[in-house]
Amino acid sequence: VIMDLFKAAGLPDGVINMVTVSGKEISEVVFKDEKFAGLHFTGSTNVFRTLWKGIGNNIEKYKSYPRIVGETGGKDFIVAHKSAVATEVATAISRGAFEYQGQKCSAASRAYIPTNLWGDVKEQIIKDVNSFKMGSPSDTSNFINAVISEKAFDSIASYIDYAKNSDEAEIIVGGNYDKSLGYFIQPTIIVTTNPQFKTMVEEVFGPVMTIYVYNEEKWEETLTLVDKTSEYALTGAILSVDRYAAETACKMLENSAGNFYINDKPTGAVVSQQPFGGARGSGTNDKAGSVLNLLRWVSPRTIKETFVPPTDYRYPFLGE
């Protein structure tokens, strides 16, 4: 459809070409060509690292150094301060974790809730999840649809089963899945006593949120924990009425999320308004949807023209 739109808009044939093939197959051809000039990749962190290694192994073959841009995985967070409003925190979780079944790299998948808010937040998110309608996307009243494939279904289900069988975790809502009539997974919220629990660290890429309840007086310690828990740094959000606490979080988490949200869910960046991307294991942070990304693909050329060329090599300070 995209190529049809380009053609209908008048783009000449050959300016853009679409080749549908596996990344492994095409990389074995493209990465060995001396004219290879750049890669813009969106996908998993491990695949991106493999592609980068492949480019590096062929670096002597290329006419120039290839540009490499990647937007990869995320383990995106929500952190609530003790001053936050419980209903706002619950809504950020419900929307941030479960829109599109959590199948986007910016979806929230771990949350840190203070002890003083936990009772109210827990009650609201359970109420929210139980109210979700699940079914076909053709019915726009359905908040939850099927996940994209059987492979994704099986992977997500394995994380849910891991939590069910762990002494360090409790599923407070959801936890069921069924692929008899489509790859449907019930939105699931896990509460863990271990901030390094598997589903707090690894990217699940599905409708699974894991929550760690922290001592309400340990704000800065919790922010440090958030920063060090995951290899990713794509998106994150903090919710706080206390402005000083929000500014503290903004500073302490400056390397934890390329897209950082205050009093909102950590997803839903608007193209051309909120440049998107993160660093660490989440990619090269070249900000898709902005001029910053476009500049990665140009090759600047500097030209100097002298209108009065010198006729003597001697500079004035050299004397006669």
Indicate where each model-derived feature is located:
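PLP-dependent aminotransferase-like
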Residues: 1-27, 59
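ALDH superfamily catalytic-core signature
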Residues: 8-10, 15, 32-34, 38, ...
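Short catalytic-loop micro-motif centered on adjacent basic/acidic residues
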Residues: 15-18, 38-41, 235-238
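Conserved residues at the C-terminal ends of beta-strands
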Residues: 22, 42, 211, 239-240, ...
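Beta-loop-alpha module in the N-terminal Rossmann-like domain of NAD(P)-dependent dehydrogenases
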Residues: 23-29, 43-48
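A structural signal for short, well-ordered beta-strand elements
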Residues: 82, 212-216, 239
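C-terminal core of ALDH-fold dehydrogenases
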Residues: 176-188, 219-307
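Glycine-rich nucleotide-phosphate-binding loops and adjacent flexible coil segments
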Residues: 207
